[in-house]
Design a protein with these regions (language model features):
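Class I S-adenosyl-L-methionine
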Residues: 12-14, 24-27, 33-162
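S-adenosyl-L-methionine
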Residues: 1-22
């Protein structure tokens, strides 16, 4: 049985369900900073619950991934989606990290490992776009470690398909 709620996610009435029930919360279409705030609020309200999230931030994926990792969440799956010439990272994460989850990495892991050769141009385009985005930032806002991390991811991806 499932229910849809349209309300402040921190106010989700999870206490009305059994502690044994698994809860899947979907948050999509919001910026990365807000998405992290929402996940933090849910975890603070329900610290002992087994929760799973499907998350699709529209910006700040690097920040989102670092924050989710810092919150102790584990990665169940991740996918790169392209729609209307925009890219989206979709993350399925869980509060129960082991044994079926992986650590959440800052630039992605599973979504690159499951690529086939036909998907390589899309992945290359996405990573190039992300690198370009960070390189265009004003010098005082640039974060060389983020640029370097995505450049390494792109180089690794390209080397695997040579």
């Amino acid at each position: 049985q499932w229910q849809v709620h349209c309300l402040d996610v921190a106010a989700l009435p999870l206490e009305q369900t059994s502690d044994k029930d698994k809860q899947l919360i979907i948050i999509a279409g919001v910026g990365g900073e807000l998405l992290v705030e929402l996940v933090r609020a849910i975890l603070a309200q329900h610290p002992l619950r087994h929760l799973e999230f499907i998350l699709c931030p529209v910006h700040h994926n690097y920040y989102v991934r670092q924050s989710l990792s810092a919150l102790g969440l584990g990665l169940k799956s991740e996918h790169l989606l392209e729609e209307n010439q925009r890219f989206y990272e979709i993350l399925h994460v869980s509060t129960i990290a082991a044994p079926n989850c992986l650590p959440i990495t800052a630039t992605g892991s599973l979504m690159w490992q499951t690529l086939d050769e036909a998907s390589l141009p899309r992945a290359h385009s996405y990573l190039s776009q992300v690198i370009g985005h960070y390189q265009r930032m004003p010098a005082h806002k640039q974060t060389p470690e983020i640029i370097h991390a995505y450049q390494q991811q792109l180089a690794q991806l390209l080397s695997e398909y040579e």
